[in-house]
Amino acid sequence: MAALQEKKSCSQRMAEFRQYCWNPDTGQMLGRTPARWVWISLYYAAFYVVMTGLFALCIYVLMQTIDPYTPDYQDQLKSPGVTLRPDVYGERGLQISYNISENSSWAGLTHTLHSFLAGYTPASQQDSINCSSEKYFFQETFSAPNHTKFSCKFTADMLQNCSGLVDPSFGFEEGKPCFIIKMNRIVKFLPSNNTAPRVDCTFQDDPQKPRKDIEPLQVQYYPPNGTFSLHYFPYYGKKAQPHYSNPLVAAKFLNVPKNTQVLIVCKIMADHVTFDNPHDPYEGKVEFKLTIQK
């Protein structure tokens, strides 16, 4: 029976490792001669250069097929969503409640409105132009600076009594609060057939708490008639219109009953806007519960 191989000592193992790192007899470093290391390095360098070039070529060809001014994928909704400011979400949608006599209960709501309208100051709209045509503002060319399209100004003062400039409390202090309604953007969307879309806010019966003694909701709209002027449409996308600002409509509720919760729905009335989608409660309208305590 052959004798067991003698175990190598630590010094022997270190000597073999040093010889593997550099063998002076054969001129090899890590098992290869310097010339072979050069050829291997050149091969991998060329390989990765070619792979990087092919990848860049694929990206270039892909980018040539994409229109930078039109999104490839858009929401399947035919109508824009509608948002509300101030927006306070409860367990079941928008729920806004405050006490007239407690400033702290509505200070946060007015702060939200002031912050939101900060983007509608004249200074923030200086790159936009004044529009008054009340007709669709079609733009076939990129005539604005930096190869963009013009955007129409919308400043907070157009909301008049609900601008926060005349009444910093937006009517919350007197129990006649202002709410701002905004339509979400859809590229090249035309809301109606040459008729400005308008906002219509009404009381709506709560299925769980029906009421028959409530009077119709009285509303003051700003701009007048609660319309979104047509010259803000169509929207051509963020790249084409980097300075675009959504038009707004403010609704000031004048006769909300105190110490009771009411359900209010604000709909966009336009030919091409629908608000009866059971799968999306914010398509074409916004619903919210409002409680004003006294």
Curated annotation (Swiss-Prot):
Membrane topology, as annotated: Single-pass type II membrane protein
Entry-listed glycosylation sites: N99, N103, N130, N146, N161, N193, N225
Bridged cysteine pairs (disulfide): C131-C152, C162-C178, C201-C266
PROSITE patterns the UniProt entry points to: ATPASE_NA_K_BETA_1 (PS00390), ATPASE_NA_K_BETA_2 (PS00391)
InterPro entries tied to this protein: Na/K_ATPase_sub_beta, Na/K_ATPase_sub_beta_sf
GO molecular function: ATPase activator activity
Modification note: N-glycosylation is necessary for assembly and functional expression of the pump at the plasma membrane.
GO CC terms: apical plasma membrane; potassium:proton exchanging ATPase complex; sodium:potassium-exchanging ATPase complex
Pfam families recorded: Na_K-ATPase
Cytoplasmic side: 1-36
Gene Ontology biological-process entries: cell adhesion; intracellular potassium ion homeostasis; intracellular sodium ion homeostasis; pH reduction; potassium ion import across plasma membrane; potassium ion transmembrane transport; proton transmembrane transport; response to lipopolysaccharide
Transmembrane segments: 37-57
Record's subcellular location: Apical cell membrane; Cell membrane
Tissue expression profile of the protein: Stomach.
Presence of the UniProt keyword Acetylation in the record: no
Span list, region immunoglobulin-like: 194-294
Keywords assigned: Cell adhesion, Cell membrane, Disulfide bond, Glycoprotein, Hydrogen ion transport, Ion transport, Membrane, Potassium, Potassium transport, Signal-anchor, Transmembrane, Transmembrane helix, Transport
Extracellular compartment segments: 58-294
Subunit-structure text: The ATPase pump is composed of two subunits: alpha (catalytic) and beta (regulatory). Interacts with alpha subunit ATP12A; this interaction is required for the formation of a functionally active pump and targeting at the plasma membrane. Interacts (via N-terminus) with alpha subunit ATP4A (via the P-domain).
UniProt similarity note: Belongs to the X(+)/potassium ATPases subunit beta family.
Described purpose of this protein according to its UniProt entry: The beta subunit of the gastric H(+)/K(+) ATPase pump which transports H(+) ions in exchange for K(+) ions across the apical membrane of parietal cells. Plays a structural and regulatory role in the assembly and membrane targeting of a functionally active pump. Within a transport cycle, the transfer of a H(+) ion across the membrane is coupled to ATP hydrolysis and is associated with a transient phosphorylation of the alpha subunit that shifts the pump conformation from inward-facing (E1) to outward-facing state (E2).
NCBIfam families: Na_K_ATPase_bet
Domain notes: The C-terminal lobe folds into an immunoglobulin-like domain and mediates cell adhesion properties.
Name this polypeptide is given: Potassium-transporting ATPase subunit beta
Organism: Rattus norvegicus (Rat)
